[in-house]
Regions:
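Short hydrophobic alpha-helices and adjacent helix-cap/hinge residues
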Residues: 1-248
Length: 248
């Protein structure tokens, strides 16, 4: 799924930037990249490599200006103000929370979003076929993903019955609903848990898992959980709870 998202993402950006052959001006186009996580985010390296594969090499014929909120969503207004001040030519943003903040802060710079499960229900765009104003992007929603993840958990734990599903309260419930539906289809008992950012109460979430005797944990590919993946991993290890993270 990630490769498919990146392919469309890079192609979208490619249409917005001049090709190296057509670029005769001395000014090098600037591309802003904004994510809610930290610099260790694998998607940024894939983003930069994807642009290079299309002929847009950072430091040669484009300049990439990466910014990472590191889980502090209150930083978004300042981040976008800074990038507007740098006169970036296009903004690439990941996640619904980031896309909403970009939409609010920027009106005259092309915005390309990715890793948004449901752009309409997440209040990123009003219409998928005709996105608002300066917005375009791709959805990462694939209902089959939950089935594959749950089947993998069952292979690891043949006795699997109760699976906790941890999601982000700040985005739509599309991925959570699909995961619950697929769990029931596999005769599993899902436990819905949603935490709110930027400082989620993960201790309470894990206490609820212990109370319900969860056999395993499925962590959804949603913003606040990507930011706090290390803390989730540590709590799961402490409880000796088998955990599967979606790629991020």
């Amino acid at each position: 799924m990630l490769s498919r998202v990146l392919t469309v993402f890079m192609l979208s950006l490619g249409f917005l930037l001049p090709t190296s052959e057509a670029q005769q001006v001395t000014r090098i186009p600037r591309v802003g990249f904004v994510a809610p996580q930290g610099r260790s985010l694998p998607l940024f390296d894939a983003f930069r490599q994807g642009l290079a594969n299309l002929g847009y090499v950072d430091g040669q014929n484009i300049l990439i200006e990466p910014r990472f909120a590191e889980g502090h969503y209150e930083r978004f207004p300042g981040i976008f103000a800074q990038l507007v001040g740098l006169k970036v030519d296009v903004l690439a943003v990941t996640g619904a929370v980031t896309a909403r903040a970009a939409k609010k802060a920027v009106s005259d710079i092309p915005l390309v979003f990715s890793v948004v499960v449901d752009p309409v229900r997440d209040n990123v765009v009003a219409n998928l076929r005709q996105p608002d104003g300066n917005l375009t992007g791709v959805t990462c929603f694939d209902p089959r993903q939950a089935t594959k993840q749950l089947k993998l958990l069952r292979e690891i734990i043949p006795s699997l019955r109760r699976v906790a599903v941890l999601g982000d309260q700040g985005v739509s419930e599309a991925l959570m609903n699909a995961s619950e539906e697929q769990a029931r289809a596999l005769d599993l008992q899902p436990q819905r848990l949603r935490v709110a950012g930027p400082n989620p109460d993960l201790q309470a979430a894990f206490a609820a898992m212990r109370q319900q005797h969860a056999d395993a944990l499925l962590v959804l590919e949603e913003p606040v959980l990507g930011v706090h993946a290390k803390e989730v991993s540590e709590l799961a290890a402490k409880d000796r709870l088998p955990t599967l993270f979606a790629p991020s």
